[in-house]
């Protein structure tokens, strides 16, 4: 069965001032009507070079926003640029070359268009590529593009650096709750934590006021570490408003995901966010979802539960949580 890719729809509609009806959001979702247009509060920017202030800053941002940007994170600029270059080149390949990597609906890896079950039958203005980048035992190179030829090298190099950043963030989140630094990482599987890369490709859209690249959602991961290209589009929901996230070159955007909210018993917030699209420029982003293995049991940490503060969340296998989330079933 042939699947219609958004990139193909966008190229056909370049001369039009309209988009297919299945991409037009209801009024309560349309970014043209729902984006806050007053003074925008500053999303926290945290300097990982400031070793004295990092724990307090990460914990406060995770409580108040569920999202923050990190600078001086130690990942060389050229490593990020290479990751972005090879990803962009993949999406510029002829369509039939990309379809070789079409999504496997069992593992959720590969090239595709539709992921989550959409309410109201609406579609998101995005194509994507998913594949695991860590641990080695979870990597299936059948989903790693062979073109461009240095795709594998660029992704492996990025993964190596990103593991260190992930460890630093998880340690800070643990310490920020008065726990020992290793607690969160161990509660998520330790060295078995899995890193899943997604490349989002948001083609130019003639009606960015009506469409969304990705509708409002929280990430099911523990944390998500994301680098975007220079085209803004990420929006965060806070205080009943949708706010634009400012683009900071070479910063990494950190999303607190559902598993950290569960472990922390709600002290840290999984951030509700969405993505807008652009009329003139292609937007791309490279989120990496850091998650426990599928069979791993995740629940509120016992250290954070007492008679006065009972656990707010069920303990369950991560794969069962995933299934419910993707199929919009109650947890």
UniProtKB/Swiss-Prot annotation:
Pathway assigned to this chain's UniProt record: Flavonoid metabolism
| Gene name linked to the record | FLS1
What organism, scientifically named, is this protein from? Crocosmia x crocosmiiflora (Montbretia)
The domain of life is: Eukaryota
Its protein name is Flavonol synthase 1
Q: Which UniProt keywords apply?
A: Dioxygenase, Flavonoid biosynthesis, Iron, Metal-binding, Oxidoreductase, Vitamin C
Which PROSITE patterns did the record assign? FE2OG_OXY
Q: Which cofactor does it need?
A: L-ascorbate; Fe(2+)
Name the protein family.
Belongs to the iron/ascorbate-dependent oxidoreductase family.
Pfam families linked: 2OG-FeII_Oxy, DIOX_N
Residues recorded as binding 2-oxoglutarate, renumbered to this chain, are 283
Disulfide-bonded cysteine pairs: these are none
Fe2OG dioxygenase domain sequence ranges: 191-292
Q: Cite the InterPro entries for this sequence.
A: DIOX_N, IPNS-like_FE2OG_OXY, IPNS-like_sf, Oxoglu/Fe-dep_dioxygenase_dom, Plant_2OG-oxidoreductases
């Amino acid at each position: 069965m042939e699947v219609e890719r958004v990139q193909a729809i966008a190229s056909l509609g370049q001369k039009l001032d309209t988009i297919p009806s299945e991409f037009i959001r209801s009024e309560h979702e349309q970014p043209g009507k729902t984006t806050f247009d007053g003074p925008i509060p500053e999303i926290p920017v945290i300097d990982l070079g400031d070793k004295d202030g990092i724990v307090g800053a990460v914990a406060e941002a995770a409580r108040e926003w569920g999202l923050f940007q990190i600078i001086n994170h130690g990942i060389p600029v050229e490593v990020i640029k290479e990751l972005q270059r090879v990803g962009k080149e993949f999406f510029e390949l002829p369509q039939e070359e990309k379809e070789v990597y079409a999504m496997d609906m069992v593992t959720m890896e590969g090239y595709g268009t539709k992921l989550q079950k959409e309410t109201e039958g609406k579609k998101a203005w995005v194509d994507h590529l998913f594949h695991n980048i860590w641990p080695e035992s979870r990597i299936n190179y059948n989903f790693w593009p062979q073109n461009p030829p240095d795709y594998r090298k660029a992704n492996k190099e990025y993964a190596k650096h990103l593991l260190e950043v992930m460890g630093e963030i998880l340690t800070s989140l643990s310490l920020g709750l008065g726990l020992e630094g290793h607690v969160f990482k161990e509660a998520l599987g330790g060295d078995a934590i899995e890193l899943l890369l997604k490349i989002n490709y948001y083609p130019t859209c003639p009606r960015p006021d009506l469409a969304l690249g990705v509708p409002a959602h929280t990430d099911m991961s523990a944390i998500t570490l994301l680098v975007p290209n220079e085209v803004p589009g990420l929006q965060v929901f806070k205080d009943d408003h949708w706010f634009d996230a400012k683009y900071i070159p070479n910063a990494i955007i950190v999303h607190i995901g559902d598993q950290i909210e569960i472990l922390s018993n709600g002290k840290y917030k999984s951030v509700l966010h969405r993505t807008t699209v652009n009329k003139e420029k292609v937007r791309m982003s490279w989120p990496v979802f850091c998650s426990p293995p599928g069979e791993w049991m995740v629940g509120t940490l016992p250290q954070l539960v007492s008679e006065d503060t009972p656990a707010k969340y069920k303990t369950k296998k991560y794969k069962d949580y995933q299934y419910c989330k993707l199929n919009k079933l109650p947890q």
